[in-house]
């Protein structure tokens, strides 16, 4: 029966093992700085094995480096003795939700998630500090004491990670930002699945360095795109140019494995359709409407609709060529007003005469004012709503800013909900995990829930945020939000409540006759604007028949549940060791222990957890049942053979208990025999 590690993996050790497996003859022994014999890699032997050019000393080479880069790599690889403690009182629907909200330093949280979520995340979106000269960034300096942090900055967390303003007068301006972002990106790569993708928002200050970081970590060939994201809200802190754009860097874990089919809805299509329909209702002629739409599509917000400059009762459409190369279909098409044959080109029509007549009868042909204009086919926007995402995007952030201000959350430049929904929808699936480890006001969580409500998806979110204190002068602080995590959690609660209320209202609306037949939705959309609106609401009611997960489990990063003696028993005198009744900290609950066990065993933190109470003989006991017997954890004291036998008969995959919980020496002696009899395949672990 083995003891659990109860600490994160040492990536440097893992890398050593990989090299040793590939090149065992390169493994040797040497003396370290403490005089101990340790295993090492013989560089000369390794170079012989891989037979490649080695760049030595000051020899010129292309490289991306900065002061403390080596320290950043070591920081990413170093293990930590931390845990995530559940907080039921701040959670929503803790027992049933599959969403997570994690409070803590995101570097530490990423390390804690590293084994459990290794290769399991399909999409990561982050909006890190932009390093504008007035940002707060993490300074991962674990050597200084908390008192020293207080003296240096006046801003720190209980683990000794401080937040410092990275002013552009600082000589380490880019270095500090790189030291912050680099180790986090390295660990994030491990969390991505082979077909996973990562999106990162950034501006001009660090786009170059961020691109180089991602090229080094992911490989230059896995950079998919750098989107330019335009906004209608200018940042008034620029001296010469009003900045109205930023960037969205998209990188794949492995581009060869990344799924194709990135068909996304055109941005701002609802707004464009609404304006077009208003023009139809205004009574203007087709030519007048065409002129107004030509002017409208010159605005960045509507540039995707530059061909959809006509509109009728069905909606906006683009005029397409009715001829086809090599076609021999030659016949007269009669103008509906002049009753004369329309102009034809050198090529034949793309449709047979009977097919053309059906298109005319159903008003799918656009005729000119006279027969001198060649007729064209109406291609409607609702038939072409999805396409490959464009590299230039436009999103209105004002609505999100107004909503945030109304909630008194105190964020000056929140990301637009529609923008994050668009980013998430680029991944061609509706059931996957979304991770945001700079979650801020939790826009990503809001977007995931909203998108699920709209398309019936089953996406899940993991939000990670440091509980950074809010400014005492801010509206958020005055409204009672003492740190950013309080804002994020409250936003998810309110957004979830709004989504649930909307669903309930839609469910109360009786289905119309046509709503029950999905195949009729497209056909009734061709019968007028009212039918289009009716179709849209019908889709919404059908979508809302599925339940949206608007809950979340709150987990908080904290020191390990285990006392120091658990990790370094050799450093304690035997007399002291024997007096320690337990190696678990006194203030930790059984559920605290369960979540650290789940992390150690690689069990997803949103797994189904049931607390069961049983009675065997005269003895009552309780235990945690995770995922219907995949893990059974019993942290009761004085566990006897009857309890061990009852648990073994359930045949769990894992069984975990306290090392100190066995009632007597007889239980310890017979423990393995009991499991060998009833459940020999169960993996047994102790704390």
How would you describe each model-predicted region?
Residues 235-306, 561-564:
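Flexible, glycine-/basic-rich loop-and-beta segments that form/coincide
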Residues 112, 116-117, 125, 268, ...:
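Segments forming glycine/polar-rich beta-alpha architectures that bind adenosine-containing cofactors
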Residues 140-148, 178, 205-210, 416-498:
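Conserved S-adenosyl-L-methionine
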Residues 164-224, 482-508, 534, 560:
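Conserved Class I SAM-dependent methyltransferase catalytic core
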